[in-house]
Amino acid sequence: MKNFKNFTLEDMKAKRLELKKEYLDLRFKSVVGHVENPLKKREIRRDIARLNTMICEYELGIRKV
C-alpha cells in the first residue's frame, strides 16, 4: 500500500484531500487541453481509494493507529 502505512489518521485525511484536488485539476486539464501524463489520473484515483480504505479501517477499529 504505497507509503501510507506510517501515516496518522489526520495525515491520511489531509493527503486524501490533497489528492482529490490534484485529481480534479487533472480532470479539468484533460477536458480543456493537454495532459502530460494521462496515467497519472489512474494512479491518483487508486491512491484515493487506498486512503479511503485505510481511513475506514481506522474508524472501524480494524487497523490501529
From Swiss-Prot:
GO terms for cellular component: ribonucleoprotein complex; ribosome. The keyword Membrane does not apply. The keyword Ribosomal protein applies. One of its GO terms (biological process) is translation. It comes from the Bacteria. InterPro entries: Ribosomal_uL29, Ribosomal_uL29_sf. Pfam families: Ribosomal_L29. Keywords: Ribonucleoprotein, Ribosomal protein. GO terms for molecular function: structural constituent of ribosome. CDD domains: Ribosomal_L29_HIP. Belongs to the universal ribosomal protein uL29 family. This is Large ribosomal subunit protein uL29. The lineage of its organism: Bacteria, Pseudomonadati, Spirochaetota, Spirochaetia, Spirochaetales.
